[in-house]
């Protein structure tokens, strides 16, 4: 039996977190939530998730800044970036910084399953 993955969802939209939580729990994951990048960094350190779904545009600390800090303290953790306003430049920037993948919102169930499979390969 496969290990139950612990996934951190970070998005300022409570509705999106709720939707993504339901999707991931339906796929057998344990889910932790954060509503901004600062909280994501703290929860990464405290909870030790297996992977992170991280929105790019958030108040206080955005996803790109959070990714930089997370990479400094946890360089191996798989991070999937999420954005509704992603440009090719942002996509390339996050991938160069070590993001595993990038999903454009609104996402499909198939994209989440694929991202989860990518995370599973890394843990």
Question: Model-derived features: where do they sit?
Answer:
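Conserved sequence signature across two-component system core domains
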Residues: 10-11, 34, 52
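Active-site beta3 strand of CheY-like receiver
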Residues: 47-53
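Acidic catalytic/metal-coordinating carboxylates
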Residues: 36-39, 62-65
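Alpha4 helix (beta4-alpha4-beta5 surface) of REC/receiver domains from two-component response regulators
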Residues: 65, 86-101, 113
């Amino acid at each position: 039996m496969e290990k139950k993955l612990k996934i951190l969802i970070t998005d300022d939209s409570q509705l999106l977190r709720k939707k993504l939580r339901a999707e991931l729990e339906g796929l057998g994951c344990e889910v932790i939530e954060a509503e901004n990048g600062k909280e994501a960094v703290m929860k990464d350190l405290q909870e030790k998730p297996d992977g992170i779904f991280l929105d790019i545009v958030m108040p206080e600390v955005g996803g790109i800044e959070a990714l930089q800090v997370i990479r400094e303290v946890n360089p191996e953790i798989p991070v999937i970036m999420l954005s509704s306003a992603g440009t090719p430049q942002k996509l390339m920037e996050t991938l160069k910084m070590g993001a595993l993948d990038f999903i454009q919102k609104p996402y499909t169930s198939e994209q989440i399953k694929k991202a989860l499979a990518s995370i599973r390969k890394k843990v």
